[in-house]
């Protein structure tokens, strides 16, 4: 299981291998705390939830990194474009077996129309919501292009335009 967070200090998306961290917990009890912090950070939507501080060590000195929801960098991720090309350039053979990508996007792809109240906070909220939606679409296109380039079977599930349940509140 891979989970993404955003290191706000570095303005970088970080992908965590949660399986490896869980396995490390057998010999390193602090790995369980890191696992929990990553889970919290991955859901820490800026301004809605507090960021999560993660302890790190650089050149023998302790630091803390501020992590929030990985969606501030990428709504959906697969692997870096051109990864297979880079691996091949290093002389590593890549097995040519069939590969598939399955993406579950917990959102609609079409824009939702709404009258926007003429207030600063409402306008800002709607603008941020629009940014998030377009970033998500861009991420899907990027993953599709990567899948095509690498010969992967691309599969996408999302909430269709025919879904009409009433939205009562955020995070419901």
Region spans (language model):
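Patatin-like phospholipase
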Residues: 1-172
């Amino acid at each position: 299981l891979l989970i993404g967070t955003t290191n706000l200090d570095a303005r970088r998306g970080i992908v965590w291998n949660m399986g490896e961290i869980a396995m490390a917990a057998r010999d390193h009890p602090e790995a369980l705390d890191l696992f929990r912090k990553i889970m919290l950070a991955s859901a820490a939507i800026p301004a809605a939830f507090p960021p999560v501080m993660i302890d790190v060590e650089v050149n023998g000195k302790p630091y803390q990194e501020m992590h929030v929801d990985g969606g501030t960098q990428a709504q959906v991720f697969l692997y870096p474009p051109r990864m297979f090309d880079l691996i091949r350039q290093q002389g590593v053979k890549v097995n040519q077996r069939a590969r598939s990508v399955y993406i579950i996007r917990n959102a609609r792809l079409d824009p939702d129309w709404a009258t926007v109240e003429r207030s600063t906070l409402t306008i800002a909220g709607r603008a941020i919501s629009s940014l998030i939606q377009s970033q998500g679409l861009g991420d899907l296109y990027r993953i599709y292009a990567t899948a095509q380039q690498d010969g992967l079977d691309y599969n996408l599930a999302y909430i269709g335009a025919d879904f009409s349940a009433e939205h009562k509140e955020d995070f419901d």
